[in-house]
Amino acid sequence: MKISRETLHQLIENKLCQAGLKREHAATVAEVLVYADARGIHSHGAVRVEYYAERISKGGTNREPEFRLEETGPCSAILHADNAAGQVAAKMGMEHAIKTAQQNGVAVVGISRMGHSGAISYFVQQAARAGFIGISMCQSDPMVVPFGGAEIYYGTNPLAFAAPGEGDEILTFDMATTVQAWGKVLDARSRNMSIPDTWAVDKNGVPTTDPFAVHALLPAAGPKGYGLMMMIDVLSGVLLGLPFGRQVSSMYDDLHAGRNLGQLHIVINPNFFSSSELFRQHLSQTMRELNAITPAPGFNQVYYPGQDQDIKQRKAAVEGIEIVDDIYQYLISDALYNTSYETKNPFAQ
């Protein structure tokens, strides 16, 4: 079924307020979740609300966080987030990074002790809309076997990039360092769909197409994805003095406790390196040139990275956002959550 962006936003905001989140924070979380669903990233959209509601109600997301911004240098800062909702902390951290890059050319802002922040391309697009290049990366729960390994160590550790072209054009790239994000498995479960056998393995280490049999995810491109998830764990965890590797808290372990996750934003002001106008012209030229490339057999069009999601977002603004009926029924119900996510086992979800 499809519903309007405004309706979905209000339903999510109301449910999070029902769980105990203050209206201002609930609106920010809803904004990021609706953004994800509008772009077809359903793994990070409304499917997450029930889990968030349970964690908020149990105190694992701080309903009254005391944020503290520590400016550690002219271009660097740490936002101590007090286990606030991740979307709220990440948006706040990016706002400070943008102000710093405006004045000093570059900014690096670490966000310390936060909750799950969702689709992190939202935050790099904040920077792009301000005319800057945005890069963001964050930790996630351990659920990935390292290349050549049989035991879980790292999380899906996503990485996102966005840069402004001419007008309102934005080039956006957002990826998990696994073949697919864990949320894609959750989305497949909610839709009763199978998954490709390249995404994950079962408890015996055998590739599986059954999303309910998943025991661990696989790194993207083998050793390359493995290396990237290591880098992100170092920059968003080790660098900030936070838990790292398999020490990172599980999303489903103790919903009464804060996640203590880390995220790192990097913002670059093109004016300090060439000129903003020239940069934007060349970026739009890149996008046009990629679109003009002759497609390979089996393809109708060459897209620049993120273009397929841009198209979905524009379409959703006109036609509404696709949402699974079970999720819609939950959002309009009085229930805070139907089944507890506190299983201590992410693969039981």
Curated annotation (Swiss-Prot):
One of its GO terms (cellular component) is cytoplasm. Keywords: Cytoplasm, NAD, Oxidoreductase, Purine metabolism. It is found in: Cytoplasm. GO terms for biological process: allantoin assimilation pathway; purine nucleobase metabolic process. Changing residue 141 to E: 14-fold decrease of the affinity for (S)-ureidoglycolate, but same affinity for NAD compared to the wild-type. Strong decrease of the catalytic efficiency. InterPro entries: Mal/L-sulf/L-lact_DH-like_ah, Mal/L-sulf/L-lact_DH-like_NADP, Mal/L-sulfo/L-lacto_DH-like_sf, Malate/L-lactate_DH-like, Ureidoglycolate_dehydrogenase. NAD(+) binds at residues 140, 174-176, 224, 306-308. Its EC number is 1.1.1.350. The record marks 48 as: Plays a crucial role in stabilizing the binding of (S)-ureidoglycolate. Induction: By glyoxylate and allantoin under anaerobic conditions. The keyword rRNA-binding does not apply. It holds the Pfam family Ldh_2. It catalyses: (S)-ureidoglycolate + NAD(+) = N-carbamoyl-2-oxoglycine + NADH + H(+). NCBIfam families: AllD (TIGR03175), PRK15025.1 (NF011599). AllD plays a pivotal role as a metabolic branch-point enzyme in nitrogen utilization via the assimilation of allantoin. It is able to utilize allantoin as a sole source of nitrogen under anaerobic conditions. Catalyzes the oxidation of ureidoglycolate to oxalurate. Belongs to the LDH2/MDH2 oxidoreductase family. This is Ureidoglycolate dehydrogenase (NAD(+)). It comes from Escherichia coli (strain K12). The lineage of its organism: Bacteria, Pseudomonadati, Pseudomonadota, Gammaproteobacteria, Enterobacterales.
